[in-house]
Amino acid sequence: VKESWVRPASLRGLFALPLMVAITLGMASVGAAHVLAQGVPSAAAGPPGTGLAWGNNSDGELGDGTNNGSSTPIAVDLPAGTTITAIAAGTAYGLALTSAGTVLAWGDNSAGQLGDGTTTDSSTPVTVDLPAGTTITAVAAGDRHSLALTSTGTMLAWGENFIGQLGDGTTTRRSTPVAVDLPAGTTVTAVAAGDRHSLALTSADTVLAWGDNSAGQLGDGTTTDRDTPVAVDLPAGTTITTVAAGAYHSLAVTSADTMLAWGYNIFGQLGDGTTTDRDTPVAVDLPAGTTITTVSGGARHTLAVTSADTMLAWGHNNFGQLGDGTTTDKSTPVAVNLPTGTTITTASAGAFHSLAVTSTGTMLAWGYNALGQVGDGTTATRRRTPVAVDLPTGTTITAAAAGNRHSLAIAPSTSTTTLQVTPPNPEPDQPVTFTATVTCTGSTPTGTVTFHDGTATLDTEPLSGNPTAILRVTRLTPGTHSIHARYNGDSNCPSSTSNPTTVTVPKPTIPVTGTSLPTILTAGSLLTLTGAALILAHRRRPAHGA
């Protein structure tokens, strides 16, 4: 708490008097971040925020504490004060990476995929039992197995492992994380989980794969399952920048802006113009001049966002999941029929439905919807073209992940600050205190609030535990002041600025000093003072002619 002199620009140099004011800060949110697309199910990353979920909830995969499904987004019941930066949707469960580098999980836990040491389902998020001192930077969710990338470039895995999808050299199911048996000296930079296989992108821009290989989805030229990572047989000279996994197929984007795919292809999900399975990577038949920025693999279809912010889709289309207005399978990419003027920033492919986030923070969805996973408030069997997800009023989305029959999203945190003015209409001789109380969705705000009078900065005060910031002003001058306050934000809660509040301080009556005269001028004392002045002047007038 500090005290300071404050005067309006129009009255600099005049009387300085105290003031108190109340202001409400407007809502603000952090900007969109790039989504790291993963397989079916999928994962996505964005700035810190809260979780939303919709669709089927029979296993608690919406994380709201119930088993009731919802055809519109509802809040995931995160622990108090928790914000999340990435989400992943498994077949019937969810993962969330927190701002603190820990992992939360909820939903189906039949194979230990929640990583809490049990096989008990949970309809609210539980903490994954990570090794002490571990910080996680990315997560991915498969059918019933989970992957995590650590800050040191190693990998952890847990859940189902009957086909070696955990990569620890065994086929033993794990209910807590174990280390993936990476080749010596390997640093992993990104992870992706398919139905029963796993992918890792390394710092050498190569790709490792392990687990189920029945359709060649490991890309090593065989159909032999692997319980430890093997190298994907990439074309010579290829550098990979992004990986994604479908249920039984795998995807990669190269530094040359081409795209590779391998594995199961009966519905054309590899996009090479055939329906032939591939046990080594083949080129996706992209339209000429197309550059891919984000990819995502569904159960039997694939989505891609282009550098022109449009979308392509190919593969299975029985429920309209390609979004082209038909239910015809496509073995080469076709354009998603987006609303006019829409710009897509991220996409996620579920089992039989698709999600997309727009540049304005809205969401589109299409495909299978019998359980409300499209999120438009209906359970229409299918949507062949994109429709708007019915988000809560004022909500923006920065990341989305599509599961089997449910959907997840991150809504970035917003902050609001209320300022109380006491007294609300200050007199010239009254002190004024600005008390700013800050609230933030998903977390407890920390940091500072800066108080402003027009373009002038009054002072910056720290938030206390309430959390409030207080500034006392003892020299606010008469006149009109335009007061606003700005919460400066922290790593989990964004900044926000109030609308200006006009505060007018009246001019004081003119004080007069002296032993026998009034201290405040009134009409009567003004006459008295005037008469006294005239008498004094008369007495001091020199004699005529002197």
Which positions does each model-derived feature cover?
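Solvent-exposed beta-strand/loop surfaces, strongest in extracytoplasmic domains of secreted
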Residues: P412-A546
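Eukaryote-biased RCC1-like beta-propeller repeat architecture
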Residues: K2-P412
